[in-house]
Regions:
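Hydrophobic (often cysteine-bearing) scaffold residues that line and stabilize catalytic clefts
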Residues: 38, 42, 91, 95, ...
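Short active-site loop at a secondary-structure junction
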Residues: 55, 78-135, 182-191, 266, ...
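Solvent-exposed coil/turn segments that connect beta secondary-structure elements
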Residues: 64, 75-77, 141-142, 234
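Short, surface-exposed loop or secondary-structure junction motifs
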Residues: 130-326, 330
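Residue-level preference for non-acidic, small/hydrophobic
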Residues: 46, 65, 99, 103, ...
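Secretory targeting and sorting signals
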Residues: 1-32
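Catalytic loop of the DD-peptidase/beta-lactamase superfamily, centered on the K-T-G motif
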Residues: 2-4, 27-70, 258-406
Length: 406
């Protein structure tokens, strides 16, 4: 174990860096075919995120029995408590992968047809009966993302909804005030509305709440004891990292956004979890523990997002610079950025968290944890030395995706 205290000038800015690599048993090898994780590279990413305005950042890599834990900065700016990889946090759109798992299990059970119209199960919900379940799950429905309006102004938008409680129908109604962005199936267009519809499908087909289905189908079977869906309660249970929202105005004070209902997102973004639980979840998913092989294959039918990313059914694929592809989801919710991804076989998984949002520099920096975790030292060194490494590759977040973050 290596640990060091890193001073940042004030008590509130005191930062802790801690690194722990723990083999489950002697001789456990790194995930087959992958370079060893670059711990120094991961440390550098976290340190950079703090220099760009994140109060704290952390990452956990589960590597075929060996665990790497790194953290730097604070979980609570008021007390100066150091952030740790055991802290719980809001995972934002990583929730979409949980919703997709439930729906694909329902396909396995013969209760849902991916190519059926959404209106088959929710009569009259959508104005175009050509929109299928598959198109909703792959963001090809054309349904407008209501969060573009809700959070066009970041902090005022958040404050206007942080204590509100919406129904699923309320959120769909907000979306349907706008025309669709494309014909069904014609294009990829990320929209939180799609996974609100997913939540409605889950509740209609099971007769139970989304919370109950998550718990019974995923949280309990995988022993995810740090994972919760507490909507509409505003508090994060147990020890957690506070979230800090960056205002749109340059130099504005960070806003503590920890407590909120997240009712504006629900099945699109309201899960709470930890680095360990998200690693466990995506390892289980990619190793075939949560659905049949046939449905896991359906989940990985990719729609092109850009030259290095694809979107399946509630699952992202990111193609790294070393030629390795990883699978999982990103998450943005006010005050939290999450990257949670696993290898194709699920033997290596990584979850990285910075407790801020609306900060494009931090968003891009935290993406580099994937390179360090999956590509190893040589790739990390090349990225650090390359002039292109500072280029912004993420200009959009998972909330208000129509708003460019410059």
């Amino acid at each position: 174990m290596v640990s060091a205290m890193v001073g940042r000038g004030t008590a509130l800015g005191a930062a802790l860096f801690a690194l722990l690599a723990v083999p489950a048993q002697a001789g456990t090898a790194a995930a087959a075919g992958l370079p060893a994780p670059d711990d120094a590279g991961l440390q550098a990413v976290l340190h950079t995120a703090l220099s760009q305005g994140a109060p704290g950042a952390m990452v956990r890599v589960d590597d075929n029995g060996t665990i790497h834990r790194l953290s730097e900065g604070v979980a609570d700016r008021a007390t100066g408590r150091a952030i740790t990889t055991t802290d719980r946090f809001r995972v934002g759109s990583v929730t979409k992968s949980f919703s997709a798992v439930v729906l694909l299990q329902l396909v396995d059970e013969g209760k849902l047809d991916l190519d059926a119209s959404v209106n088959t199960y929710l009569p009259g919900l959508l104005p175009d009966s050509r929109i299928t379940v598959r198109q909703v799950m792959s963001h090809r429905s054309g349904l407008y993302d209501y969060t573009n309006d809700m959070f066009a102004q970041t902090v005022p938008g958040f404050e206007s909804v942080r204590n509100k409680v919406f129904s699923f129908q309320d959120l769909v109604t907000l979306s349907l005030k706008h025309a669709v962005t494309n014909a069904p199936g014609a294009a990829y267009s990320y929209s939180n509305t799609n996974f609100v519809v997913a939540g409605m499908l889950i509740e209609k087909l099971t007769g139970h709440s989304v919370a109950t289905e998550y718990q019974n189908r995923i949280f309990t079977p995988l022993n995810l004891t740090d994972t919760f869906y507490v909507h509409p309660d505003t508090a994060i249970p147990g020890t957690h990292a506070n979230g800090y929202l960056t205002p749109d105005e340059a130099g504005g004070a960070l806003v503590d956004s920890t407590e909120q209902t997240v009712s504006w997102a629900q099945s699109a973004g309201a899960v709470i979890s930890s680095t360990q639980d998200l690693d466990t979840f995506f390892s289980a998913l990619m190793s075939g523990q949560l659905m049949s092989a046939a449905q896991l294959a359906q989940m990985q039918q990719w729609t092109t997002v850009n030259s290095t990313q694809g979107y399946g059914l509630g699952l992202r694929r990111r193609d790294l610079s070393c030629g390795i592809s990883v699978y999982g989801h990103t998450g943005t919710v006010q005050g939290y950025y999450t990257y949670a991804f696993a290898s194709k076989d699920g033997k290596r998984s990584v979850t990285a968290l910075a407790n801020t949002s609306n900060n494009v520099d931090v968003l891009n920096t935290m993406a580099r944890t994937l390179e360090s975790a999956f590509c190893g030292k040589s790739t990390t060194a090349k990225l650090r030395s390359a002039t292109s490494s500072a280029t912004t590759v993420e200009r959009y977040e998972d909330i208000a995706p129509g708003i460019t973050r410059d």
